[in-house]
């Protein structure tokens, strides 16, 4: 099983991750990881921090001569902004007299609950660790799983279907055409858009909406569409709750900062229809074997992969740090006041799509390892190839 821990504060010296359980023999270069880190930094509506940081991963262990060796992989991404925060975020010195404590929580953020939970007299430590800056380390770690999956024929991609009231109208036929070449083809097309949308008209509407929100001191959320192609039938299990593929994918997405909802396939539309209009009927064709009439289940049935493309949707709330402050209070004096502003983005939905790709990568990689086992890439590739052949032949008359 692949697992990882991240560490580091938003304005500390660095972010880090230790990734354990990666099979040996997976070819990895720093450029592969840094490409994904650069994708996470893109998107119209990002804040001033992106002008400071150019995220680059340093690999300290677990790779030799460009291939994984089975041992834990240690990754570090240094924060360039640290030099401006050495006093405020000092690890061992006494706090300077001119450092003001943050005592006014922002509605919608971790500020108040984190302060109370950890017995803090200053909200700053809560801000530092709960910040979405932490997802830099998650993207670096998840890219390791993503590269492993690509080596066994599984691809992951995303695009943004809505930002604020600017909704996507991309035809399903266009998406299906892109997915035939693999989910990364769809992601590359989305990356050519400033907001990672596929529809140029809606892209323009989204940019206008972001500009309007920025001018008003407001923020915008949106909807992320995630696709996973090349998934073999039978990943996950209905035997126990913690082996259910849909549950693990949903948990991974909900763990991303500001993600408040997850949908698998067309789940919410399905809930309003009779079963006869929902379930994906089986079709046996002489040469192609088993196909389906549709994919409303999103590639998962009975908590297992059906062999179809997995389709997930994630809803991201608007960022909770607003230039136009909301009503709050001072947690020391209990006096009503307006919320404070912490440097932030107007819209980070495009970046969240890249984080979502990284998060589901590790879930799918673990489902593969659970089903097929193996400590070296070569033996896993052999087992999956055999499984694909047997599955295909089983449905050809």
Curated annotation (Swiss-Prot):
Keyword Chaperone among UniProt keywords: no
Residues bound to FMN: 129-131, 257-258, 302, 317-321, 343
CDD domains: Chorismate_synthase (cd07304)
Enzyme class name: lyase
Top-level lineage group: Bacteria
A Gene Ontology biological process term: amino acid biosynthetic process
Entry's family note: Belongs to the chorismate synthase family.
Quaternary structure note: Homotetramer.
HAMAP family: Chorismate_synth
Protein name in UniProt: Chorismate synthase
Organism expressing this protein natively: Chlorobium phaeobacteroides (strain DSM 266 / SMG 266 / 2430)
Organism ancestry: Bacteria, Pseudomonadati, Chlorobiota, Chlorobiia, Chlorobiales
UniProt gene name: aroC
């Amino acid at each position: 099983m692949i697992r990882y821990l991240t560490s580091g504060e938003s304005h500390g010296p660095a972010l880090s991750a230790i990734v354990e359980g990666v099979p040996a023999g997976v070819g990895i270069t720093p450029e592969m990881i840094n490409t994904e880190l650069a994708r996470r930094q893109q998107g119209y509506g990002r804040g001033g921090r992106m002008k400071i940081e150019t995220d680059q991963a340093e690999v300290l262990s677990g790779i030799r001569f460009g291939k994984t060796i089975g041992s834990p992989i240690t990754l570090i991404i240094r924060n360039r902004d640290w030099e401006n925060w050495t006093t405020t975020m000092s690890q061992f010195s006494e706090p300077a007299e001119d450092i003001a404590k943050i005592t006014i929580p922002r509605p919608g953020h971790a500020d108040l609950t984190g302060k109370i939970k950890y017995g803090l007299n200053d909200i700053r430590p809560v801000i530092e660790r709960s910040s979405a800056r932490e997802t830099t380390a998650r993207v670096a770690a998840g890219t390791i799983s993503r590269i492993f999956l690509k080596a066994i024929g599984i691809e992951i991609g995303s695009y943004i279907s809505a930002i604020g009231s600017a909704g996507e109208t991309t035809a399903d036929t266009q998406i299906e055409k892109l997915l035939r070449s693999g989910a990364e083809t769809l992601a590359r097309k989305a990356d050519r858009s400033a907001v990672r949308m596929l529809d140029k008209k809606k892209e323009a509407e989204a940019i206008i909406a972001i500009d309007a929100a920025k001018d008003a001191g407001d923020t915008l959320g949106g909807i992320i569409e995630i696709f996973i192609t090349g998934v073999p039938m039978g990943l996950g299990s209905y035997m126990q709750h913690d082996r259910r593929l849909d549950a693990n994918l949903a948990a991974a997405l909900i763990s991303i900062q500001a993600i408040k909802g997850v949908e698998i396939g067309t789940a919410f539309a399905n809930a309003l229809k009779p079963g006869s209009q929902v379930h994906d009927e089986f079709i046996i064709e002489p040469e192609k074997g088993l196909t389906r009439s549709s994919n409303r289940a999103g590639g998962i049935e009975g908590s297992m992969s059906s062999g179809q493309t997995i389709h997930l949707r994630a809803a991201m709330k608007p960022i909770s740090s607003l230039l136009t402050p909301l009503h709050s209070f001072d947690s020391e004096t209990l006096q009503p006041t307006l919320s404070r502003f912490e440097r932030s983005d107007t819209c980070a939905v495009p970046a969240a799509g890249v984080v979502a790709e990284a998060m589901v990568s590790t879930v799918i990689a673990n489902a593969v390892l659970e089903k097929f086992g193996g400590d070296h890439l070569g033996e896993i590739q052999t087992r999956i190839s055999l499984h694909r052949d047997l599955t295909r032949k089983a449905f050809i008359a």
